[in-house]
């Protein structure tokens, strides 16, 4: 890796967790996985829009200990990139960490050095973001800025010069494709969950625009200088709820009007307590110029892409993933169908896809 390498929504995982997931978990308490946390300050960070911040804070959590070969190369680092507007600690959810991080499990924290960063700009994280003070004057970052910030964290903050595995979900999945193209020697393999490597367009882009406009066109937003969260954020969260829906499961879980109404109210009320409108807008707009489809042949790492059915963001019926993965020389695609699928957020449910992950890891031995 070159020198230029360069309580949140844990509850969401619980919402989608089924009893089938429990049997695969370690006995889980709040202290089962107690990560080390830290901050790295990167100086004079120039954004893709031309603006520069004199310093940015990059927060991270780690589990395990890095191991190096005789040449000093880190051999056991696993970077796990979260989705839009979340934080690294979402991966400590029982349905993920309890299935993967325990003794003898696929990402055993005593074997691997697990790195869970809070990505630049993410509202639920502790890394630098608009709500820290700059609000709408914050640089208009994109995914390339976020990837570069994570690369700087690894190289300069954690002295990690190689990744055995990059795991990315949703936004982190898209960033994985970008990273594998721009720095193909940085990692041995990538597990990418719930995304496509093509331009964010069609329905996916439409929903992002609608959510951003929900806030931007609310007079209460006041060009980002609000004293309380604008009502438009509630509307945006409502749209986010719908696009994260899982029709097959939700018909069983919320079969009455009363149950559906309660879920909507609880979801929005809880998220209004933890979400900032500017952070939300910036994160969902950061995908505006994403398109990894033209460089997939540059990826050298082994790649396993797992997408679920009933994913509003990435419609399986379009067949895009099947076609695009052919461009990756060592790529494989798995489509999870019901009952394995939990919609877009299936990535939180490691028990639903760990058998495919286990097969993939064997190819790295």
What are these regions (language model features)?
Residues 25-77, 88-90:
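Catalytic-loop region of hydrolases
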Residues 61-131:
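N-terminal cap/lid subdomain of alpha/beta-hydrolase-fold enzymes
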Residues 144-164:
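Conserved acidic catalytic loop of the alpha/beta-hydrolase fold
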Residues 162-201:
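Conserved hydrolase catalytic core segment
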Residues 186-270:
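Alpha/beta-hydrolase-fold enzymes
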Residues 299, 305-307:
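Short beta-strand/loop motif that positions the catalytic acidic residue
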Residues 312-319:
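Conserved alpha/beta-hydrolase "acid-adjacent" motif
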Residues 332-365:
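Catalytic active-site module of serine/aspartate enzymes centered on a nucleophile-bearing elbow/loop
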């Amino acid at each position: 890796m070159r020198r230029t390498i360069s309580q949140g929504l844990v509850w969401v995982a619980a919402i989608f967790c089924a009893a089938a997931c429990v049997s695969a978990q370690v006995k889980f308490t709040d202290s089962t996985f107690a990560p080390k946390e830290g901050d790295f300050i990167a100086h004079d960070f120039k954004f893709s829009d031309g603006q520069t911040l004199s310093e940015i804070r990059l927060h991270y959590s780690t589990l395990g200990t890095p191991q190096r070969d005789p040449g000093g190369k880190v051999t056991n680092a696993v970077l796990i990139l979260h989705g839009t507007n979340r934080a690294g600690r979402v991966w400590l959810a029982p349905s993920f960490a309890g299935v993967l991080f325990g003794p003898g499990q696929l990402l055993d924290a005593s074997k691997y050095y697990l790195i869970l960063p809070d990505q630049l700009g993410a509202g639920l994280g502790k890394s630098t973001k608009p709500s820290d003070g700059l609000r709408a004057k914050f640089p208009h970052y994109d995914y390339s800025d976020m990837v570069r910030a994570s690369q700087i964290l690894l190289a300069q903050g954690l002295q990690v010069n190689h990744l055995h595995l990059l795991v990315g979900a949703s936004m982190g999945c898209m960033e994985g494709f970008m990273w594998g193209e721009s720095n193909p020697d940085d990692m041995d393999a990538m597990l990418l969950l719930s995304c496509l490597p093509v331009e964010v367009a069609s329905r996916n882009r439409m929903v992002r625009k609608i959510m951003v406009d929900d806030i931007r066109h609310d007079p209460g937003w006041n060009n980002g200088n609000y004293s309380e969260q604008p009502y438009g954020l509630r509307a945006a969260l409502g749209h986010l709820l719908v696009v994260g829906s899982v029709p097959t499961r939700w018909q069983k879980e919320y079969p009455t009007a009363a149950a559906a109404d309660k879920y909507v109210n609880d979801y929005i009320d809880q998220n209004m307590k933890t979400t900032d409108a500017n952070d939300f807008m910036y994160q969902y707009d950061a995908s505006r110029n994403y398109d990894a489809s033209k460089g997939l042949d540059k990826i050298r790492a082994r790649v396993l892409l797992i997408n679920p059915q009933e994913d509003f963001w990435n419609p399986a019926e379009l067949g895009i993933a099947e076609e695009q993965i052919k461009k990756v020389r060592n790529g494989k695609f798995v489509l999870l169908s019901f009952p394995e699928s939990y919609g877009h957020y299936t990535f939180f449910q490691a028990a639903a896809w760990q058998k495919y992950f286990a097969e993939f890891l064997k190819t790295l031995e």
